[in-house]
Amino acid sequence: MDITDLHRMNELVEMFKEVASVLKKGRTETVYQNAITVELQERGIQYTEEETMPIYYKGKYVGQERLDIVLHTWLQVIIELKATTTDIKSDNLWQVISYMRYKKYKHGVVVNYNQSPSKDLTYSVVLLQDDLPYIYDLETGALTELTDYSY
């Protein structure tokens, strides 16, 4: 991740934290999503919400999935939101990875506005390098290859 992308990813995480600080726990995923879009609008960052991704099986259309928030220019990133009582799971990571591959984006982030009394906001930054997925630690810069292919 280059220095500009790193700076922008950190700014994005600060937006997630601001939303968590103001709204607290007990909201739906949609409410958190709407609040994030307010943060993006205030900064003039272009995005789309609920962008559809068609799914094909053996050349036949079988359905679609929806990408929560997609940033296109400021930082090409897919944002997948959760509001659950559990930690971010590998299937959440693989969900955003499939979206990243579809969009041909190198950056993704899964954000969980954790509803558990003992947990707060959690997030995982995902990078694709040579189509291999990694979890990126913003604080240390460490890359950990995601090898749990159980999804």
Question: Which residue ranges define each predicted feature?
Answer:
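Interdomain/boundary linker segments immediately adjacent to catalytic/signaling cores
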Residues: M1-K25
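Active-site metal-binding core of divalent-cation-utilizing nuclease and nuclease-like domains
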Residues: T28-Q76, P117-V125, L143-D148
